[in-house]
A protein has these predicted regions:
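Acidic, glycine-rich active-site loops and adjacent beta-strand->loop/helix elements
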Residues: 90-92, 146-158, 177-182, 388
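Zn-dependent metallopeptidase/amidohydrolase metal-coordination segment
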Residues: 10, 295, 353-357, 362-431
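Generic non-transmembrane alpha-helical segments
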Residues: 10-17, 21-28, 51-59, 134, ...
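Active-site metal-coordination/substrate-binding segment of hydrolases
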Residues: 57, 62, 81-150, 397-400, ...
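Midchain, well-structured core segments that form catalytic/ion-binding scaffolds
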Residues: 155, 161-314
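A short beta-alpha structural unit
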Residues: 249-250, 288-293, 302-309, 330-349, ...
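Buried hydrophobic packing segments
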Residues: 125-135, 164, 224, 378, ...
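Acidic/His- and Gly-rich active-site-bordering loop/insert found
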Residues: 2-113, 142
């Protein structure tokens, strides 16, 4: 049999097991929490790592647990050659209120596995595991150092993979399997900054609430003139914090502060901050508020900025600080994460893209996205799958997607991801040999 015939045989032989194991992993509610387990991200994230560890050992793969932050997986010990890391994660975001199905039941409905994290990123994790296990099962030698890494804190800062890379070192190339095929050749930069100003006398408190895994908070509660109000996320109110602070009522003590802050809230491209920018590869700067806090004197708003790949993120930080000095607002930089960009002509990016297009008779192009994945932590890397960019899921509006209600992964898209990862691993290994 040739390679593709072996892949088809492998998928046919293991299809029920692949679905069953994916369902089993989905049943673990691996949401990052602080508990008394002694594990860095809580007992459930640790259980997910243990599950993956056991499954890998059943497949005769070699594993190393990096203190329950990451699990490293290889075909054999003492691998040599260039190093490829394929990174996925077992942690998930918290559930939402409007699920139709139990988010941690891990059940199949029609052609879909439904449950929290099955798209982001447990399905892709299982796909990468079975892709590497294919080489072990069929005795196909890999000449280079091919590793999987399963993380536990991708959704809350990615310090898990940082911890791993500090100890294991950077690979020659890294792949993040955390979006759609064919290839993600860049991610926008990220800056979080806060603005504080004295609150108006009639404002007792304004605070927003949400999980640390979800960017924009789900609720904004305020007490003004003794009257309590809670604004929640609805179809019409996408951002409760923005809705609260763009109403008719003045919330800040000084008229000038109110004016400046309303300008920022209304300026989604960052013009008033001096950071508006556009490039053909990644689009334009985006700015949005996502959190509100208050104390006895001040209101603090925290904003998320996504920057095009050609905009120097250090310049963005400098301009934010300069804006604070110019306006008298208290500006603090909360978080900075540099994006990345690989030219579409990069030999691995182009090879993987062509591989996908050939396999599916498509004409897809590499793309840049605003979301953050493990790919940005590699000195050299990109995203590679594992979703279908044209899939239309048979669920109600707002259901079926990553981070949403009733997250759902098509079983055949999952099998396609395994096939593409096998082909991708083999192509990179051959190229490096």
């Amino acid at each position: 049999m040739n390679l593709k015939e072996q892949i088809e045989e492998y998928l046919q032989k293991n299809k029920f097991e692949i679905v069953s194991r994916t369902c089993d992993l989905v049943k673990i509610p691996s949401i990052n929490v602080e508990d008394h387990s002694g594990k860095p991200y809580g007992i459930e994230c640790a259980k997910a790592i243990d599950f993956c560890d056991q499954l890998c050992k059943e497949k005769y793969l070699v594993t190393k647990n990096y203190d329950y932050r990451c699990l490293e997986v290889m075909c054999r010990e003492n691998q040599t050659g260039k190093r490829l890391i394929i990174a996925t994660h077992a942690d998930v975001v918290p559930t939402v209120d409007d699920n139709i199905y139990d988010p941690f039941a891990g059940k199949v409905y029609g052609d879909y596995i439904v449950g929290r994290g099955v798209v982001d990123d447990k399905g892709p994790l299982i796909a990468s595991l079975y892709a590497l296990a294919f080489f072990k099962e069929y005795g196909i030698p890999l000449k280079n150092d091919i590793r999987l890494v399963f993380g536990s804190n991708e959704e809350c800062g990615m310090d898990d993979l940082q911890y791993y890379l500090e100890r294991a070192g950077q690979p020659d190339w890294g792949l993040a399997v955390d979006d759609d095929f064919p290839t993600v050749n860049g991610e926008k930069g990220l800056v979080h900054f806060s603005i504080s100003a004295p609150k108006a006398e009639h404002v007792e408190s304004v605070n927003s609430y949400g999980s640390k895994q979800r960017l924009v908070h789900d609720y904004c509660e305020s007490t003004i003139n003794g009257e309590n109000m809670v604004i929640g996320r609805t179809e019409k109110v996408i951002n409760p914090v923005l809705h609260r602070f763009t109403g008719e009522e003045r919330l800040f003590k000084n008229d000038q502060d109110e004016k400046y802050i309303r300008e920022i809230l209304a300026d989604i491209d960052g013009h008033c901050l001096g950071i508006n920018h556009f490039d053909e590869m990644s689009g334009k700067t985006s700015v949005k508020v996502f959190k509100a806090e208050s104390d006895a004197q001040n209101i603090t708003l925290t904003f998320d900025i996504r920057t095009p790949v050609t905009l120097d993120i250090d310049d963005v930080v400098e301009k934010l600080i300069a804006y604070g000095k110019k306006t008298g607002l208290e500006v603090k930089i909360v978080k900075v994460s540099k994006g990345y960009y690989q030219k579409p002509e990069n030999e691995i990016v182009s090879m993987l893209t062509e591989l996908y297009n050939k396999e599916f008779n498509a004409n897809e192009k590499p793309y840049v996205m605003g979301a953050c994945t493990y790919a940005r932590l590699f000195d050299n890397g990109c995203g590679f799958g594992g979703g279908n960019p044209h899939e239309v899921k048979p669920f109600p509006k707002g259901h079926g997607a990553a981070h949403g209600a009733d997250e759902a992964h098509n079983i055949y898209v999952l099998f396609d991801a395994i096939k593409m990862l096998i082909l991708g691993i083999k192509a990179i290994d051959d190229k490096w040999s």
